[in-house]
């Protein structure tokens, strides 16, 4: 371990120790106070990363089990800390990662991309919309926007940029600068449009459910995000194109698409089966209530079906590093969060807010302030998941005691987590991957990100709120 990592480790170990030696605040049990210290240390660990996320959470889980065993007086078993690993939410994420990996291993993701390039990629603006349609098609089945944007969309679009004579060092503004920003800004929009488009969505909804006791189905989420999301997908490539127009306008898309499809060859049986399974997965998630199952059940059935049909092999599942990493840290953070809820930490936090913050009955003002703050603080987080575990419970409790409309605030918070990450090139793991290709500078990236973030915010608090109220009135949320 190097010196820098050692200091990071000392910091996250010091946090629960310091909090543990301090007396618990009035109204909060000693168990809840010490568990909060461990949870806070886990959050800091996710941000500064002395170890990979799974290691940080395993340490936090181990410490929490020791604390529960010694301070709970039998009220809770140590296995309560492990509840996140038995949560359907955790397995939904893992199963969706397997579906996502199948698009790469079968080549179906590439085939869809080249078909789109051949149809609408005859201009550089059209290529921007290729990123829109490709990401939108893949989003429901890809709970990692890093895998989606960085693993599927980026390699294809980058090869197109190179083919058009755009190089990071010599000619970034020819087309690469525009296309790279399009990939990132688009994926930050599609990531909030579907419950399963980003792992953080599933974690965020679980927290909203624990704190505000609101239920939102896969279909309800997609309907709520659909109108503002589609509007932003339509304008995003155009806004980037207007602010930083590429030097070339026309593209020989037919040649590029033909070469790409020729390399892939005829559509294979695995691709056809995957396409069928993908459609069935979407139908299952949309009509899960009518079918009498939940979203997690659909995801696990899909994974089992892909293994049964040979679309993916068990070796493919084992090699899916992103899925296993997420399973470990995700299950850990859900378990810790659920335990904090059980020991009434969030109830205590609500009372603190209620006694110290007042909007004097102006619930709509509270709604505006909470959502605006949720975007501003994203400047300080390089991880959407770290933001969720650190700030979402705070904003949710603030909404609960301020008189803000709860369903509207919940939806706005669930969506702002993703688009708030537009503001910087480190606002999500996909950012460093795309920015690292070398076509973009920080100034232009941050400027475009700020403009699109503000525009998205305005769309959500105007047309979005109107649309959500309509859905609530129709009993569709």
From Swiss-Prot:
Outline which residue ranges sit on the Periplasmic face. Answer: 27, 72-87, 170-219, 294-297, 378, 467-477
Q: Chief location of this protein?
A: membrane
Q: Where in the cell is it found?
A: Cell inner membrane
A Gene Ontology cellular component where this protein is annotated is: plasma membrane
Q: Which residues lie on this side of the membrane: Cytoplasmic?
A: 1-5, 49-50, 109-148, 241-272, 319-356, 400-445
Q: Does the keyword Zinc apply?
A: no
Which UniProt keywords are present, listed alphabetically?
Cell inner membrane, Cell membrane, Membrane, Transmembrane, Transmembrane helix, Transport
| A GO term for molecular function | transmembrane transporter activity
Is Transmembrane included in the keywords of this UniProt record?
Answer: yes
Topology with regard to the membrane?
Multi-pass membrane protein
- The membrane-spanning stretches of this chain are 6-26, 28-48, 51-71, 88-108, 149-169, 220-240, 273-293, 298-318, 357-377, 379-399, 446-466
Annotated family: Belongs to the SLC13A/DASS transporter (TC 2.A.47) family. DIT1 subfamily.
Q: What is this protein called?
A: Inner membrane protein YbhI
